């Protein structure tokens, strides 16, 4: 949805769920996905979502005009990022290949560096920097440990899987009204009882009379 002279820019290969809200100065890159109930509100500043990044269901992404020093505070999310369900990103930067867990909050001016992970439910306070390759958690979030090799590999797998998953949802969401009606007709046909099948079960005889009404 546009807001004044600010219009969202969504790549043709991206998926934005029908119930998601993308408002104002927001760009969404190729292969990225914005899931059901998510809100991206670029009103007083801009939101940039890179490529192959997933913003999962119920997440809120917002911005701030500037901090007390006058520095602009957009929200920038890089490539191959996973943002879990119901996370909150506010005027922050999430670099390439990072993961923000479900229900986590990232506040103004915070930076989650590339290849790092924020645990579910954590609060990353304003101005905090989460270093690459680290796991942070808690409220306020603090360094917990370095990521294992398996966890580092999972960061890429998570983004890849969501990019693939989104394509099926995009195919359905992009269907025309006529195609949806045709799908409904086909589904109705597939759920109709076949007389020959009923005869083979002995539910009806060849005259069409039902023999075992309790089986229908």
Which positions does each model-derived feature cover?
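Glycine-rich hexapeptide-repeat left-handed beta-helix
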Residues: 1-5, 9, 43, 51, ...
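Short proline/glycine- and basic residue-enriched helix-capping loop/turn segments at helix->loop/beta transitions
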Residues: 82
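Extended, small-residue-rich solenoid/repeat segments and analogous flexible loops
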Residues: 1-31, 202-216
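A positional/architectural concept
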Residues: 10, 14-55, 59-65
